[in-house]
């Protein structure tokens, strides 16, 4: 919004410092400011950590430094406001379209305080009162337009108990609240688990207790985006936090530790602050305390490398996207929470399997449930908006539509329970929890119009017949409008003016319009109201009385409708706990139906939970099998403490195979069926991964220090109940050092930890450790190598796991398949021949150690191969051949054996993990060293 004294100015390119807080220029002229700017300054001082958007008419305005920020971030015009006290920069955004601008400010890491006009301009002759009604931050978003998807948005808080300075002995607590739904949770964690738990929860905003060293929780080091907030330190004080909690739960000291009380108290205090200091958030009706050791723990590294929720590729699929067949936002959030915290209790897992199995037995009912669940709106967020007094009439109708689906959902569940012979404790419980909420349904259905306007103050919100007084007022209003509509006919007949018209404008009200040629026929009782170019507008005493009656009735009706709607909304809000219970049940049912749907459509099988054995028969990668036309299943069988040494070329599928096993274990413990012909899964306590980029050369590669840091975490924290996936440990350093580190790692895991481990390596002599480690065995990926008449060779990856160690890494052949120029490939082959046969050979002990596999292991691997039995020629016919090579590049071939260091450097190169540019740079470096 601009005034006659506003002028455009250049916003510049750099953000000015401190756009939040009171502008220095206004502080120095406080006594001279206009009343409106004084209001703005007061809002800025009250919220120094936020950028204030100040309502002026139909715009939100910002001034001084904040104006520059708004202009640059939101790409709007920066102007100047001049008054008697000076010149102030200003920038504004239209209120009707403010959401996109607020989203841009949030993305730029600003908190936004909304200062609204809290009284109508017509209601006062002086300055309109304004107040900050909402502070929007990344972790406290409640606006439906800013909540872009069904995912939970968490505000988190971290507190740590007092200690004697020994960080290893410190314990802390992490609390989260989803302000949009009211879900609040807290857990205690060891000091070294804080990072891991935060990575699992992924709060959008994080409050740090004053006793926490922020260096230990730097947002830049977390594997997700979060805003780190320093809130009022007093909110973390135990007494203050306990007092805050007492408004939510009875006797918080009875079930929450001091660290937990401090974390929950602080997070709720901040949530209240951002909602306009409205007091306790009534819809936060329950605080759930959980333990981290009651779930399968998947740390941040594993979450990333397994691509559970985020893909490393720009358009890659994730595990949750692949298995998500939910129909509602409630189900999607539940499904994600189950994947983030898979079960670690045998009976709980089995109970969830029973529910999925009972549903999967009846595909038609599953289809019915899917269709009915699709009519369920986001009940949690609707309930929260209702409790915050932000729900409008359309929200009420959405709530009604959701509740109307519940009886049919209950009927479908009863059909499943009637027909199944399986234990169905979970489904029985859900059926009982699905309260039809008939009282709320009846209230909304009889009270709120079926197609109400967006704004509840616009009228036509309350249904006819709900309130007698409102109906009487509406009848008087309607009678007045009918009288006016009949007036035109009567006056035409009475005056003889056929062109006479009766109309209405917001400014002048009702009028009788007569064209200029007929003005001589205007009756004396007509009073002129407005003169137009070709006509005059009049009113009569009777018309004016009717107009006053209609306006008065309309205003009374609108006021009464708003009062009635607020009463209805409050009555619904009083049932928040019942609505939340139904929402929770719907979410769990939707997630179970999703599991059943994926099991039916993709032939997933029910796993068997075992004590020790991990056996997968013809397992499939759940993501890859849906993105590739042909997928070769592979299985594995190994007991607690067994280590599978996996060899084979790059691109053969080793990393995919390891991720496949991890995905199957995670799905199994989440309660889902799994992609395999059969599966026996033990209850794991943790999954660790040290996996580099995915099986193409477009992925990034971790530094050696990162690799060793991750290995340190694994070796310190893994137990015999863990699953460890290690991909080419030691590749980031010299061959000698890398081989030594890899071997020592395998021996330590075997002798000291005893965890089930999958270990891929290109150090072929490392496969000989199976001779000295009784629980280690070799697996490799089969490759078909064909020599052509011109002595050229090609390889085809069969993607099939079999026992024993690979006879070569086929690095040069992989480079050729990847399209590396022919001169580079040929020269690499010469270097290999120069080094001798020992470059590719491995010891007989490593090659033939598969004789030492247990019978079960050999049966598992061989059975999977038989399941996919086809001749190598058939496999080759279906597999892509290498790309045509580029023969334009030249290369210096002189003195190839003159410098043994150059040859060793070439041998250590992992070509398949190099980009074309890196390969050419390395080749240039080798040439230069030879020339020297």
UniProtKB/Swiss-Prot annotation:
* Function recorded in the entry: This protein is involved in the repair of mismatches in DNA. It is possible that it carries out the mismatch recognition step. This protein has a weak ATPase activity.
For this UniProt record, give its keywords in alphabetical order, as a comma-separated list.
ATP-binding, DNA damage, DNA repair, DNA-binding, Nucleotide-binding
Q: State what protein this is by name.
A: DNA mismatch repair protein MutS
Q: Where does ATP bind?
A: 648-655
State a single Gene Ontology molecular function. damaged DNA binding
Q: What is the lineage of its organism?
A: Archaea, Methanobacteriati, Methanobacteriota, Stenosarchaea group, Halobacteria
Q: Which GO terms describe its biological process?
A: mismatch repair
Q: Out of the domains of life, which is the source?
A: Archaea
The record's SMART domains line, in alphabetical order, gives:
MUTSac, MUTSd
InterPro entries in UniProt: DNA_mismatch_repair_MutS, DNA_mismatch_repair_MutS-lik_N, DNA_mismatch_repair_MutS/MSH, DNA_mismatch_repair_MutS_C, DNA_mismatch_repair_MutS_clamp, DNA_mismatch_repair_MutS_core, DNA_mismatch_repair_MutS_N, DNA_mismatch_repair_MutS_sf
Task: Give the stretches traversing the membrane.
Answer: none
By sequence similarity, the record places it as follows: Belongs to the DNA mismatch repair MutS family.
Taken from the record, one Pfam family name reads: MutS_IV
Q: Where is this region: Disordered?
A: 1-26, 865-892
Keyword Signal listed: no
Bias kind Acidic residues: ranges: 1-13
């Amino acid at each position: 919004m601009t005034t006659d004294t506003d002028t455009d100015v250049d916003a510049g390119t750099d953000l000015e410092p401190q756009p939040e807080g009171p502008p220095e220029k206004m502080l120095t002229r406080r006594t001279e400011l206009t009343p409106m700017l004084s209001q703005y300054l007061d809002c800025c001082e009250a919220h120094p950590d936020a950028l204030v958007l100040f309502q002026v008419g139909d715009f939100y305005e910002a001034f001084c430094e904040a104006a520059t920020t708004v202009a640059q971030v939101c790409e709007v015009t920066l102007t100047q406001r001049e008054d008697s006290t000076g010149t102030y920069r200003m920038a504004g955004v239209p209120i009707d379209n403010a959401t996109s601008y607020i989203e841009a400010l949030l993305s730029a890491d600003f908190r936004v305080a909304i200062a609204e006009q809290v009284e109508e301009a017509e209601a006062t002759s002086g300055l309109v009162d304004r107040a900050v009604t909402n502070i929007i931050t990344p972790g406290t978003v409640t606006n439906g337009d800013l909540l872009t998807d069904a995912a939970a948005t968490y505000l988190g808080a971290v507190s740590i108990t007092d200690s004697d300075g020994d960080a290893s002995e410190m314990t802390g607590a992490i609390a989260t609240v989803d302000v949009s739904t009211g879900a609040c949770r807290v857990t205690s964690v060891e000091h070294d688990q804080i990072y891991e738990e935060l990575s699992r929860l992924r709060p959008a905003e994080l409050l740090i207790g004053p006793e926490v060293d922020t260096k230990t929780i730097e947002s830049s080091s977390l594997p997700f985006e979060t805003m780190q907030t320093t809130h009022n330190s007093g909110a973390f004080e135990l007494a203050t936090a306990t007092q805050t909690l007492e408004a939510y739960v009875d006797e918080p000291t009875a079930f929450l530790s001091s660290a937990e009380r401090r974390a929950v108290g602080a997070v709720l205090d901040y949530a209240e602050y951002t909602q306009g200091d409205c007091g306790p958030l009534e819809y936060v009706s329950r605080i759930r305390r959980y333990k981290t050791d009651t779930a399968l723990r998947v740390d941040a590294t594993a979450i990333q490398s397994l691509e559970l929720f985020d893909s490393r590729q720009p358009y890659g699929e994730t595990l949750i996207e692949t298995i998500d067949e939910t129909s509602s936002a409630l189900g999607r959030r539940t499904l994600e929470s189950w994947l983030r915290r898979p079960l670690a209790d045998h009976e709980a897992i089995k109970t969830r399997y029973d529910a999925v199995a009972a549903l999967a037995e009846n595909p038609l009912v599953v289809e019915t449930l899917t269709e009915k669940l699709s009519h369920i709106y986001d009940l949690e967020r609707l309930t929260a908006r209702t409790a915050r007094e932000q729900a409008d009439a359309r929200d009420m109708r959405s709530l009604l539509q959701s509740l109307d689906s519940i009886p049919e959902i209950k009927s479908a569940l009863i059909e499943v329970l009637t027909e199944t012979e399986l234990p169905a404790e979970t489904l029985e419980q859900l059926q009982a929890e699905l309260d039809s909420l008939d009282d709320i349904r009846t209230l909304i259905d009889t009270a709120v119009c079926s197609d109400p306007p967006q704004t509840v103050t616009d009228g036509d919100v309350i249904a006819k017949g709900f309130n007698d007084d409102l109906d009487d007022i509406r009848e008087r209003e309607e009678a007045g409008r009918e009288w006016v509509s009949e007036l035109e006919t009567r006056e035409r007949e009475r005056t003889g003016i056929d062109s006479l018209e009766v109309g209405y404008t917001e400014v002048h009200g009702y009028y009788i319009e007569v064209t200029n040629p007929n003005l001589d026929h205007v009756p004396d009782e007509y009073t002129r109201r407005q003169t137009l170019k070709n006509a005059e507008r009049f009113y009569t005493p009777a018309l004016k009385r009717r107009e006053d009656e209609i306006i008065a009735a309309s205003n009374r009706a609108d006021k009464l409708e708003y009062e009635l709607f607020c009463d209805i909304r409050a009555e619904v809000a009083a049932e928040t706990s019942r609505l939340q219970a139904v929402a929770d049940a719907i979410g769990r049912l939707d997630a179970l139906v999703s599991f059943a749907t994926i099991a039916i459509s993709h032939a997933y099988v029910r796993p068997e939970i075992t004590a020790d054995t991990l056996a997968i028969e013809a397992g499939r990668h759940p993501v890859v099998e849906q993105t590739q036309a042909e997928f070769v299943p592979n299985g594995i069988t190994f007991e607690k403490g067994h280590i599978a040494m996996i060899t084979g070329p790059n691109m053969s599928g080793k990393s995919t195979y390891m991720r496949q096993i991890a995905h199957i274990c995670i799905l199994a413990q989440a309660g889902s069926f799994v992609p395999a012909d059969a599966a026996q899964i033990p209850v794991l306590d943790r999954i660790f991964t040290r996996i580099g980029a995915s099986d193409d050369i477009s992925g990034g590669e971790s530094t050696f220090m990162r690799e060793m840091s991750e290995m340190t975490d694994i070796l310190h924290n893994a137990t015999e109940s863990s699953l460890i996936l290690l991909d080419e440990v030691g590749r980031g350093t010299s061959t000698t050092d890398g081989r030594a580190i890899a071997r020592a790692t395998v021996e330590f895991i075997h002798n000291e930890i005893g965890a089930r481990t999958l270990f891929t390596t290109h150090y072929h002599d490392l496969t000989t450790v199976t001779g000295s480690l009784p629980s280690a065995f070799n697996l490799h990926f089969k490759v078909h190598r064909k020599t052509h008449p011109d002595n050229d060779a090609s390889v085809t990856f069969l993607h099939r796991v079999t026992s024993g160690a690979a006879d070569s890494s086929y690095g040069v052949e992989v480079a050729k398949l990847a399209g590396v120029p022919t001169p580079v490939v040929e020269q690499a082959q010469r270097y290999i021949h120069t080094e001798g046969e020992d470059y590719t050979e491995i010891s007989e002990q490593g090659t033939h150690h598969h004789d030492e596999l247990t019978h079960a292991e050999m049966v598992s691997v061989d059975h999977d191969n038989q399941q996919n039995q086809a001749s190598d020629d058939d496999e080759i016919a279906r597999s892509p051949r290498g790309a045509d090579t580029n023969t334009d590049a030249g290369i210096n071939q002189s003195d190839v054996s003159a410098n043994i260091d150059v040859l060793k450097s070439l041998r250590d190169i992992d070509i398949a993990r190099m980009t074309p540019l890196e390969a050419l740079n390395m080749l240039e470096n080798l040439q230069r060293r030879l020339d020297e």
